[in-house]
């Protein structure tokens, strides 16, 4: 018999020994899983009626769940005891990234950023982009898997691909950075970012941004920053940016 375990640290709920399922718009009461989640629950995990687990709705809530009908195509569960806001953060983090030529590298970034903590991913094309389109639905599935693996209550938003000029014109309330490899850029992201602030960080394609694109971004209020001395792949730079912002906000002393 599989059981769910909870531990409490102050206001935070720490969930242990838990299988997690994703069900948009989940609420208290009887629910039916999708065929995909039903198959995973009954066939892969071999869960039985009476087994307990957790359900995330991707919108800020986690629920206790108990399997009522172990049907392999339409499993039914009873949800109760919602845990809302346990992983809320006082800041918003968005990263805009040019999809990599190899889709697996972009998917790797999406997985790791979701695990670490991110609110939104914006996709764009620029002058040096090698990929002009992206399978956003496939990317979203990668993020859903990461949400379940890392027991997150919120599913990050991922936007369709837009041109760079449109991206930098989109509104954002917070600090705006553009990561750029240039000898004249000495300001480090970790020094430029103000703890607790919302942040939007632009990460360029394999060939980096063009000088004209950087100038356009600066005119729109973006600040050029460095991520360190090493030359990083696009997806690595994006993960480093994500981790930097999260780490600064998790520090117990103000930076």
Predicted regions: what they are:
Residues 77, 155-159, 224:
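Generic structural signal for residues in well-ordered beta-strands
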């Amino acid at each position: 018999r599989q059981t769910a375990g909870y531990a409490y640290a102050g206001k935070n709920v720490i969930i242990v020994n838990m299988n997690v399922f994703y069900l948009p718009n989940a609420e208290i009461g009887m629910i039916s899983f999708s065929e995909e989640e039903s198959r995973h629950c009954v066939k892969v995990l071999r869960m039985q009626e009476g087994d307990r687990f957790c359900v995330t709705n991707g919108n800020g809530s986690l629920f206790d769940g108990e399997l009522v009908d172990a049907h392999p195509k339409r499993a039914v569960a009873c949800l109760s005891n919602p845990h809302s806001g346990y992983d809320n953060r006082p800041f918003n983090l968005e990263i805009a990234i040019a999809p990599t030529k190899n889709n697996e590298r972009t998917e790797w970034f999406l997985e790791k950023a979701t695990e670490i903590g991110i609110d939104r991913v914006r996709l764009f094309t620029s002058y040096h982009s090698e990929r002009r389109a992206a399978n956003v639905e496939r990317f979203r599935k990668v993020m859903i898997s990461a949400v379940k693996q890392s027991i997150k209550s919120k599913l990050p938003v991922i936007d369709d691909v837009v041109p760079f000029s449109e991206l930098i014109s989109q509104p954002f309330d917070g600090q705006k950075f553009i990561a750029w490899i240039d000898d004249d850029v000495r300001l480090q992201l970790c020094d430029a970012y103000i703890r607790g602030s919302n942040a939007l960080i632009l990460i360029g394609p394999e060939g980096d941004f063009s000088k004209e694109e950087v100038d356009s971004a600066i005119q729109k209020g973006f600040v050029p920053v460095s991520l360190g001395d090493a030359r990083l792949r696009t997806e690595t730079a994006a993960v480093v940016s994500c981790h930097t912002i999260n780490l600064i906000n998790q520090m117990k002393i103000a930076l």
